[in-house]
């Protein structure tokens, strides 16, 4: 495995995080879908750019596929039947990825101000709990939305329209 992938990914994120901070209004939310293995690098890059890490929302995708390889198959191809049997329940890779972290950042509002003041000035900064409860009934940082056939598009990691709507309603008027 390439041990530099994580650091290279952080450098990539750093290449645009500052620009996002520049164009957003104070108090604006920014949601990043980050893989479980690299979410920490996104958090570091965005904090270093000046964002505030507000929360992590857990999205239960429900229908994620297990892609972990059975190690016994490797031994079978090697004609090593003893180890194939010995390790038949063992896998290489990750668990079924039903959880995807959604990282929630905000652009800081002006020093000396408050979120209440920022809401009046920019219309953003707080969140709408009642709208969020339509998607996460207990109002917590966990959401279950399944991809529909109509959500499939040209991007390999396209997200469900309902999920995007939930995030928009959470953070904007």
Model-derived segments and their meaning:
Residues 1-13, 17-21, 31-32, 37-173:
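Class I S-adenosyl-L-methionine
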Residues 28:
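Glycine-centered, small-residue-biased loops immediately flanking beta-strands
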